[in-house]
Design a protein with these regions (language model features):
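Helix-to-loop junctions at the C-terminal end of transmembrane segments
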Residues: 72-78
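Hydrophobic alpha-helical transmembrane segments
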Residues: 1-70, 82, 86-128, 133-217
């Protein structure tokens, strides 16, 4: 799997559609079309101050999935295919922000969810560049961009949307934060040297200004 495909952060549903299409569909045109469709659906709904209901905005995640999902198995080796992941991030973040604003989700809660997502994606990108991609089970458990959008859209049909935002933020925070912390605790930084600071401080030993060892008073 190429790095660009990892950056897409596809979930089980998108991956299933990609396998069905067999990697034959070019990803960029369909992703751009998905972004345009999301913009149109958000422009005509949801209506501010109302609960999510059978209006165009609730179907935006499904439309994006059907447009961008089948291209998920493509190798993404085209000259401009690197644009696909940031477009998907814009679709997901924009949808959650607009939906949260229209459904009276507290602004701090919207920011918390978006921050957790940003950290989740940053961690995946950084680890991929260091040659330590997140495990497959973590990527699947993270639901993918399509799973998170579908969850927030349809969870609002059963309960107030703030609960869905809070639940998703907590779930992703525990999943991504816990697994990432455990991974770095085991391996340390790629290419670096792990230092036991507790041991060094207890010994009171450090490096002098010229590289020699010196004893702290």
């Amino acid at each position: 799997m190429t790095a660009v495909r990892v950056y897409r952060d596809d979930g089980p549903l998108s991956r299933a559609l990609g396998r069905t299409a067999g990697g034959r569909l070019p990803p960029l045109p369909f992703t751009v079309l998905a972004a345009a469709a999301t913009g149109v659906l958000l422009a005509v709904g949801p209506q501010p101050g109302t609960r999510i209901g059978p209006e165009p905005a609730v179907f935006a995640p499904l439309v994006v999935l059907l447009l961008a999902g089948p291209a998920s198995d493509h190798p993404h080796t085209g000259r401009l295919d690197w644009l696909v992941p940031p477009i998907l991030r814009g679709i997901e973040y924009g949808y959650l922000a607009v939906l949260g604003d229209a459904r009276a989700v507290p602004v701090p809660l919207v920011y918390v969810l978006l921050t957790v997502l940003a950290l989740h994606h940053y961690d995946a990108a950084y680890r991929t560049r260091q040659g330590r991609r997140p495990p497959r089970w973590v990527r699947l458990a993270g639901l993918g961009w399509e799973g998170r959008m579908l969850f927030t859209a349809f969870a609002g049909l059963l309960a107030p949307l703030p609960f869905a935002y809070a639940a998703l933020a907590a779930y992703l925070g525990v999943l991504s934060g816990g697994e990432s912390a455990a991974t770095w605790a085991r391996h340390g930084r790629a290419g670096g040297v792990m230092v036991d600071l507790t041991k060094k401080l207890s010994e009171g030993v450090g490096d002098g200004p010229h590289g020699e060892r010196e004893k702290r008073a």
